[in-house]
Curated annotation (Swiss-Prot):
GO cellular component terms, semicolon-separated: chloroplast inner membrane
Membrane topology field: Multi-pass membrane protein
InterPro entries found in the cross-reference section: CemA
Keyword Chloroplast among UniProt keywords: yes
Protein name: Potassium/proton antiporter CemA
Single Gene Ontology MF annotation: proton transmembrane transporter activity
Top-level taxon: Eukaryota
Protein's GO biological process: potassium ion transport
Function, in words: Contributes to K(+)/H(+) antiport activity by supporting proton efflux to control proton extrusion and homeostasis in chloroplasts in a light-dependent manner to modulate photosynthesis. Prevents excessive induction of non-photochemical quenching (NPQ) under continuous-light conditions. Indirectly promotes efficient inorganic carbon uptake into chloroplasts.
Places the protein is found: Plastid, Chloroplast inner membrane
UniProt-listed Pfam families: CemA
Length: 229
């Protein structure tokens, strides 16, 4: 395949990886004051789903019980109720501030995710020729590797993503995606995804090895199975 004159894959690949992150970070910093001002001046209603509302209520009850216990241990009963009301009021304000920060974090991260997706979409449309050339560079690089290195790389990647220790990594990654999109942490859903994704990927990898590698490079499959055993 003819390569574009003067095209080098590494700078282009670096731009694909780092430019969306840099632009989204810049937008995040520039949008933060505006979003904060809009939320504080025009937001008259708090939007909470059932899980978030239950978490906020549980945190408030826990703080109220701890503060009440602290006041009961004090020796002066005359100022106990006054301090209790003041303390609960202050804790309520703190919970509201924490909730506002959570919603601002959700809005900003959701906006930056959309910006990253838009930038990558523009890259795929306008830089289609560069992507084709980059793909040819990658294929040429992989073709020049020995079968042993290829088998070792496949085994390493599959063990990282679908191996015995992969569920913890999947849990962290899915939790990070949940936080980025402002979704409430739900152990049941995350556990279901963690137990499902590795199985699906394992099936896809086995099908790819059986259907593609057996036809293209039987020796690579033999080396892979020898390492895996």
């Amino acid at each position: 395949m003819p390569k574009k004159k003067g095209f080098t894959p590494l700078p282009y690949l670096a731009s694909i990886v780092f430019l969306p992150w840099w632009v989204s970070l810049s937008f995040n910093k520039s949008l933060e004051p505006w979003v904060t001002n809009w939320w504080n001046t025009r937001q008259s209603e708090t939007f909470l789903n059932d899980i978030q509302e239950r978490n906020v209520l549980e945190r408030f009850i826990e703080l109220e019980e701890l503060f009440l216990l602290d006041e009961m241990l004090k020796e002066n009963p005359e100022t106990r109720m006054k301090n209790l009301r003041i303390g609960i009021h202050n804790e309520t304000i703190q919970l509201v501030k924490t909730d506002n920060e959570y919603h601002l974090h959700t809005i900003l991260h959701f906006s930056t995710n959309i910006i990253c997706f838009a930038i990558l979409s523009v890259y795929s449309i306008l830089g289609n020729e560069e992507l084709v050339i980059l793909n040819s560079w990658v294929q040429e690089f992989l073709y020049n590797l020995s079968d042993t290195i290829k088998a070792f790389s496949i085994l390493l990647v599959t063990d990282l993503w679908i191996g015995f220790h992969s569920p913890h990594g999947w849990e962290l990654m899915i939790g990070s995606v949940y936080n980025d999109f402002g979704l409430a942490h739900n152990e049941q859903i995350i556990s279901g995804l963690v137990s499902t994704f590795p199985v699906i990927l394992d099936t896809i990898v086995k099908y790819w090895i059986f259907h593609y590698l057996n036809r293209v490079s039987p020796s690579l499959v033999v080396i892979y199975h020898s390492m895996n055993d």
